[in-house]
Regions:
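Membrane-helix interface segments
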Residues: 31-32, 146-147, 175-176
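Short alpha-helical transmembrane segments in multi-pass integral membrane proteins
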Residues: 1-5, 61-126, 169-205
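Small-residue-rich hydrophobic transmembrane alpha-helices
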Residues: 35-99, 130-152
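Alpha-helical membrane-inserting segments
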Residues: 13, 17, 21, 25, ...
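Hydrophobic faces of transmembrane alpha-helices in multi-pass small-molecule transporters and flippases
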Residues: 1-20, 24, 45-49, 53, ...
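Transmembrane alpha-helix boundary and packing residues in multipass membrane permease domains
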Residues: 7, 11, 19, 23, ...
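Short runs within selected transmembrane alpha-helices of multi-pass transporters and secretion channels
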Residues: 51-54, 123-142, 148-160, 164, ...
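Helix-terminus/linker motif at the lipid-water interface of multi-pass membrane proteins
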Residues: 12-41, 45, 63-64, 103-110, ...
Length: 205
């Protein structure tokens, strides 16, 4: 319960936040909504690598913490960041500059392709930033610090991503690019939170 409940609650609220994001995007019209739907398919695929890193990181860190090898656990987090950043930069470049080729896989409607590409342009930095954030989350999960993982995840979503996405959606010149930018901004906030937590924990030791 101590480990599973916070993660389950975070996942539930995260899924609800995606419903809210869809509502914000719907304000821009049917074409924008369709483009967002197409872009989300690509986003889900792009997030597979950092998600895999996070899961493997949690397992590796927990093994080393259990063996009393904290230094190796820390080293694995930074190694994961490095691997993720290299892959993330490649994915970023492709999504940022050739994202229309990816959206064209799912539709032949030119307007939907461009709207999907617009969202991907704002979202693109997320492919790099999550390499850092997800490695940190994996590190904390490996230490059974799941309550903190839940708190920082909810803070990102409720304090930054949703308010910023909503604000961008009600602007006179609202665009999917600006709404998409809410994700990497929230991730930067998450990196700062987790960085502070990491420093605080190490000072206590």
């Amino acid at each position: 319960m101590k480990i599973g409940l916070p993660l389950a609650l975070q996942e539930c609220l995260t899924q609800l936040s995606f419903v809210a994001l869809c509502a914000f995007v719907n304000r821009l019209g049917l074409t924008a909504s369709s483009g967002y739907g197409v872009a989300c398919k690509i986003v889900n695929f792009a997030m597979l690598i950092p998600s895999s890193l996070m899961q493997s990181m949690a397992s590796f860190v927990s093994q080393n913490v259990g063996a009393g090898n904290e230094q190796r656990a820390k080293k694995s987090m930074f190694t994961g960041m490095g691997i993720g950043l290299v892959i993330g930069c490649v994915v970023f470049a492709f999504i940022m500059f050739k994202g229309n080729l990816l959206t064209a896989i799912f539709t032949t409607d030119a307007a939907v392709i461009e709207n999907g590409f617009d969202y991907l342009k704002g979202f693109a930095p997320e492919t790099i930033l999550t390499a850092i954030l997800f490695s940190m989350i994996g590190y904390f999960n490996g230490h059974d610090d799941t309550v903190w993982v839940m708190i920082q995840g909810l803070a990102q979503t409720l304090l930054v991503r949703l308010p910023l996405a909503y604000y961008m959606s009600i602007q006179p010149n609202a665009s999917l690019t600006m709404i998409g930018l809410a994700a990497p901004v929230a991730t930067v906030f998450g990196i700062l939170l987790n960085g502070g937590r990491y420093i605080h924990n190490n000072r206590k030791k």
